[in-house]
């Protein structure tokens, strides 16, 4: 069994780049996925609530706190429920409300474990990773036999590039409570360490651990499907996404995950329709961005540009509500060749706060798009230091080699990206194919 033995992650310390929301959610299973989304391995404090159930809980708690403003448990739970509402709706205005409730709870009871964990979760959500690390350590002191605080601490350490320490935190987490959340982190660690078969095994365990939890099952199915998709197995990926939608109709992360599968099959109109459904439900920037790429591929440049404008608005709103999205914004700008000099500056700022492999690759990509390819090469090498098999990382490296005039090396990296998944990106897989040919 995996539950009591050491986590076997070949070749590197484990890395799990996730935002730990105590209310559940989804784990971003690719380093290039946008953590501005409400993305996390579920740590299920308010498990089992439907979106309507969470809204009702918020209303009841608000009334309760009006009657008794000193109710610490209700304040902390309200803060967590506001975070849940953000996850369910994509409306980042819930996050200042969460912060207000949790700060009030903390002022009344500085050593309350649930409040401290909630503040740590919120810090991760806002990409305040240094603060999240401190809060995670404090949460462990307050509740040393609870697994959740180790998730907060580990997630923060990972984003700070502290891989051995993060691995130790997650080892403790899985030792204390082997469950969906722990297994998901094992899976992601193995994925980023280049062990996709091991990642699939661990995510299957997460799926098996989700029995009785509809959202947990849908979430795990999508993550498992994405692992199959990463290695080019579209049939298995589609089966798992369809399973998620059967259990949880309209599940937006399954709708979005189906999009590249349908696009790869040549069903571009269906892919656009699926992404529009996801965007209409929760307008996350990565959903809108992919919709724009689909429109561009379909020969509809006006609609593609409209999505770019929408992404800018969403990113502005996220920043206004306290989420640091420098890296996500830099990735998007670099992808679309928007203001190369400004994008490099933004990538440097994001990397300083978040020196993970995602930060390394983002900086490398921004530098490459700005023509500073010698410096980009160094950061690309650093981004690949864990042995991660990621087609976008490979594509970025190929572009850098091409920029430096290393034609043979560039073709090798493009071929590696396509060998892993010939349809790794709606936008860039065709570019890689042309470069190889």
Label for each model-derived stretch:
Residues 3-108, 113-114, 134, 422-423, ...:
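N-terminal leader/linker segments that initiate helical-solenoid repeat arrays
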Residues 69, 110, 144, 177-178, ...:
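Short coil turns that delineate tetratricopeptide repeat
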Residues 74, 115, 149, 182-183, ...:
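TPR alpha-solenoid repeat register
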Residues 77, 118, 152, 185, ...:
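Canonical tetratricopeptide repeat
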Residues 80, 87, 121, 155, ...:
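Residue-level recognition of tetratricopeptide repeat
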Residues 85, 89-92, 126, 160, ...:
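Structural motif corresponding to the intra-repeat A-B loop/turn of tetratricopeptide repeats
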């Amino acid at each position: 069994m995996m539950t009591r033995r050491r986590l076997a992650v070949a070749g590197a310390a484990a890395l799990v780049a996730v935002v730990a929301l105590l209310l559940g959610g989804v784990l971003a299973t690719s380093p290039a996925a946008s953590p501005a989304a409400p993305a996390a391995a579920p740590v299920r404090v308010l498990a089992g609530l439907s979106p309507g159930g969470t809204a009702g809980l918020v209303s009841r708690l608000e009334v309760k706190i009006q009657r008794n403003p000193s109710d610490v448990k209700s304040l902390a739970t309200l803060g967590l429920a506001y975070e849940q509402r953000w996850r369910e709706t994509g409306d980042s205005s819930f996050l200042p409300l969460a912060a207000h409730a949790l700060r009030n709870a903390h002022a009344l009871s500085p050593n309350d474990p649930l409040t401290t964990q909630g503040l740590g979760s919120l810090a991760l959500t806002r990409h305040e990773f240094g603060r999240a690390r401190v809060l995670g350590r404090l949460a462990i002191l307050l509740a040393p036999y609870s697994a959740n605080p180790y998730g907060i601490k580990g997630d923060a350490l990972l984003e700070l590039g502290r891989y051995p320490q993060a691995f130790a935190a997650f080892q403790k987490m899985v030792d204390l409570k082997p469950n969906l959340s722990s297994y998901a982190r094992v899976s992601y660690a193995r994925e980023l360490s280049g062990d996709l078969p091991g990642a699939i095994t661990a995510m299957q365990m997460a799926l098996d651990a989700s029995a009785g939890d509809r959202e947990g099952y849908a979430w795990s199915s999508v993550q498992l499907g994405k692992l199959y998709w990463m290695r080019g197995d579209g049939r298995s990926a589609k089966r798992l996404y369809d399973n998620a939608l059967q259990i949880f109709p309209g599940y937006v992360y399954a709708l979005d995950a189906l999009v590249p599968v349908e696009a790869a099959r040549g069903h571009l109109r269906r892919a656009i329709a699926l992404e529009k459904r996801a965007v209409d439900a929760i307008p996350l920037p990565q959903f809108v961005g992919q919709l724009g790429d689909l429109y561009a591929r379909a020969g509809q440049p006006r609609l593609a540009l409209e999505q770019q404008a929408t992404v800018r608005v969403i990113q502005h709103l996220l920043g206004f509500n306290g989420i640091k999205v420098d890296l996500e914004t830099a990735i998007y700008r670099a992808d679309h060749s928007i203001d190369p000099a400004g994008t490099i500056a933004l990538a440097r700022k994001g990397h300083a706060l978040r020196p993970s492999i995602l930060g390394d690759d983002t900086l490398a990509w921004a530098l490459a798009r700005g023509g500073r390819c010698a410096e980009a090469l160094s950061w690309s090498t650093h981004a690949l230091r864990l042995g991660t098999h990621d087609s976008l990382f490979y594509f970025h490296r190929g572009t850098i080699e091409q920029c430096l005039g290393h034609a043979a090396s560039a073709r090798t990296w493009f071929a590696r990206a396509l060998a892993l998944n010939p349809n790794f990106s709606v936008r860039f897989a065709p570019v890689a194919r042309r470069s190889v040919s």
